[in-house]
Amino acid sequence: MKRKEGKLKGYKGLNLYYQYWLPEGKPKAVLLVAHGLAEHSGRYKNLVDYFVPKGYAVYALDHRGHGKSEGTRSYVDNFNDYLTDLETFFGMVRKENKNARIFLFGHSLGGTIATAYAVEHQEGLAGLILSGSSLVPSTSVSPALLAMAGVVSALLPKMGVTLLDASAISRDKAVVDAYVNDPLVFRGKVPARTGAELARMWKHLPEQMHKIKLPILIMHGFADQLANPAGSKLLYERVSSKDKTLKLYDNCYHEICNEPEREQVFMDMQAWLAKHI
């Protein structure tokens, strides 16, 4: 396995960090990873260690305001900025892998980004894989908090409004401890503008889901308290894809790739990918 890293210019000239892992020989396909809110590309070691030895290349970008990329921590001025950055990153990955089949993998916020991206940019993608996507309001997010985020976003967009509950990411204590102690994970309050932009996507994305015609694998932990599983069910119902699969994992928390059942999750992903390459 070979690991490389680099930087690219994102929207408005922001320096964005990325890293990628290559198998020995020509890749079977490419997994392009869009990570979740407040985390970074380096937290996908389990996925990398499973898929790269099996012949897949994995490319992962740190979103603006995340990990080793520039920008105010966990802040986005407009959700479309994420999509523009991803389009730039996809172009780079495509250039380096001209004939490869590229699958977009999105987790949590990255699932929101991947879904929104697929609505407008299906060309060049072989398929979409989603994990714990944030597509509708979480049951832990009150209407009052959503309303407050919208008001504060207009006045003080970078003001922190809510903390993410680290204990809700996984039932594996080692995963939670590593998350809490990771210097590249943002442990402060999520900025109001970011919350408001995510809420905007929750409102408008359901109206656009029917535009997706790609092969799609939708996965979600049934006990996820950070991203509502109802969003994944809604996406499954509304996409126009004839080739669509929904996998719900009993007892699993938000990060199904970091849960005790992760081996089964990866086996399900691998079986799905094998049918699409």
Segments (PLM) and residue ranges:
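Short beta-strand element of the alpha/beta-hydrolase
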Residues: 28-36
